[in-house]
């Protein structure tokens, strides 16, 4: 942690960056912090409560942050995938951001929890994490902590996959009926950066704005399609959802399908093209007559 | 005349590319091939222009089945539109399946401008398949904002029932 504060002080002090985006202690657990003054670098913390994907603050949809000047951003391995995604899709220039990678031993499900990792408290995404050390960074801090415990219970994605079709339909109908269409899943997502979202279009209105199960299904199908092969798997949409809809299940399922089908895993190497937007002439097409 | 029970006639929307399948469907027509009349054709420049939302919207508006059809690989008028579409629909089809939609309601096919017979087969097969599956009431029933209220009990139940309000 001292290493992090030291680095932030140095980067801000010599003018390399104008703002360090990191984590600080808040009244309700850890929260994101924008540090612009080297004297304030003491506020920075990093532990297992640092759940947030701070890459979302690099999103060009947030011009007020861009106005602060060149940022340095603290990223875990999973967040680095989102930064790489934004660089890959020309939303951020590599030279316009200083990436401070931190080696991660897993995070808890919610930043208001205690920093102790247990099978009941560990974030589901950390269970099979293969990128606890980011590969995309300018500075890499900390020693690699021990691997996090596996989350309790069986794999929820496989559980839904194994349901019979009508049961799956009923499951999602029930889950999506709670959606209030606040679009928090979109707002929090680092990879959702369209200036005008199709969900906000009214002429023609592709996606109804009312929160009926039908409109909610349209919205999530669209969002997940746009995330296919791009989702960094940070799980922020699920955490932001006020109705506790398990959106990560859909995204994780699609990510697995993309990997099975196209051999592509979302990675923190910006030079590897994403599977949508690229193609092979011999892609399998068993479902096409 | 003996009255028969009305048979379910599915509504099927076909999103087709202008250069191959639309021309192929035109050929089927000018060749006087007989095929099921259930398909409404929507012509688009290319299968690459077909957003998965089109399919969602078709179901929302009451379609029981959807056909997506375009040029064979390597035949795209725009060189690569169908390759992009192939990847997109491979993912979308699996996504719909994961959400509990019966993907047998959707047919993907490549029909070239000279394959009038293949178009007829695609139309007839899809119509027969969707007919067997029946109306897509699951999706169409989603339009109700709230699940129907339980039948009223006790005081005042009969009056509200008489008014037809739940």
Spans of model-derived segments:
Chain A
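Iron-sulfur-associated redox domains of electron-transfer enzymes in respiratory
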Residues: 1-172, 190
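Active-site-adjacent beta-strand anchor residues
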Residues: 73-76, 179, 240
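A generic "binding-loop/recognition-motif" signal
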Residues: 79, 185, 237
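Alpha-helix boundary/capping residues
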Residues: 87-90, 179, 257
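Short Cys/His-rich metal-coordination motifs, predominantly Zn2+-binding knuckles/fingers
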Residues: 129, 182, 234
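Ferredoxin-type iron-sulfur electron-transfer modules in oxidoreductases and energy-metabolism complexes
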Residues: 151-177, 191-289
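Oxyanion-binding "anion nests"
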Residues: 182-190
């Amino acid at each position: 942690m001292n290493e992090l504060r030291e680095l932030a002080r140095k980067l801000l002090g010599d003018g390399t960056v104008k703002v360090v985006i990191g984590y600080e202690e808040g009244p309700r657990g850890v929260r994101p912090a924008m540090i612009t003054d080297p004297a304030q670098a003491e506020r920075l913390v990093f532990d297992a409560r640092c759940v947030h994907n701070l890459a979302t603050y690099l999103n060009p949809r947030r011009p007020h942050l861009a106005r602060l000047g060149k940022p340095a951003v603290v990223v875990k391995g999973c967040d680095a995938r989102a930064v790489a995604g934004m660089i890959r899709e020309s939303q951020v220039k590599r030279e316009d951001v200083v990436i401070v990678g931190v080696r991660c031993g897993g995070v808890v499900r919610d930043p208001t929890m205690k920093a102790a990792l247990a099978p009941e408290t560990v974030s589901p995404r950390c269970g099979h994490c293969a990128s606890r050390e980011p590969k995309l960074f300018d500075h890499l801090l900390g020693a690699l902590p021990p691997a996090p415990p596996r989350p309790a219970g069986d794999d929820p994605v496989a559980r839904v996959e194994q349901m019979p079709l009508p049961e799956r339909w009923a499951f999602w109908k029930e889950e999506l009926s709670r959606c209030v269409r606040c679009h928090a899943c979109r707002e929090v997502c680092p990879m959702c950066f369209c200036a005008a979202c199709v969900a906000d279009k009214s002429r023609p209105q592709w996606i109804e704005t009312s929160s009926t199960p039908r409109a909610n299904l349209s919205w999530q199908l669209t969002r997940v399609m746009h995330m296919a092969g791009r989702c960094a798997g940070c799980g922020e949409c699920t955490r932001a959802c006020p109705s506790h809809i398990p959106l990560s299940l859909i995204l994780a399922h699609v990510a697995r399908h993309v990997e099975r089908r196209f051999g592509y895993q979302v990675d923190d190497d910006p030079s590897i093209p994403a599977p949508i937007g690229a193609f092979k002439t011999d892609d399998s097409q068993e479902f096409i007559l | 005349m003996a009255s028969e029970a009305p048979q379910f006639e599915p509504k099927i929307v076909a999103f087709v590319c202008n250069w191959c399948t639309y021309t192929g469907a035109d050929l089927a027509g000018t060749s006087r091939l007989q095929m099921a009349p259930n398909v409404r054709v929507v012509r688009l420049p290319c299968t690459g222009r077909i957003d998965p939302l089109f399919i969602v919207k078709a179901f929302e508006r009451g379609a029981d089945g959807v056909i997506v059809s375009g040029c064979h690989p390597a035949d795209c008028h725009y060189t690569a539109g169908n390759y992009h579409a192939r990847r997109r629909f491979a993912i979308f089809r699996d996504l719909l399946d994961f959400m509990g939609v019966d993907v047998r309601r959707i047919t993907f096919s490549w029909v070239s401008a000279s394959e009038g017979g293949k178009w007829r087969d695609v139309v007839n097969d899809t119509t027969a398949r969707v007919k067997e599956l029946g109306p897509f009431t699951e999706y169409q029933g989603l339009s109700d904002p709230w699940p129907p209220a339980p039948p009223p009990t006790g005081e005042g139940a009969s009056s509200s029932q008489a008014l037809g309000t739940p």
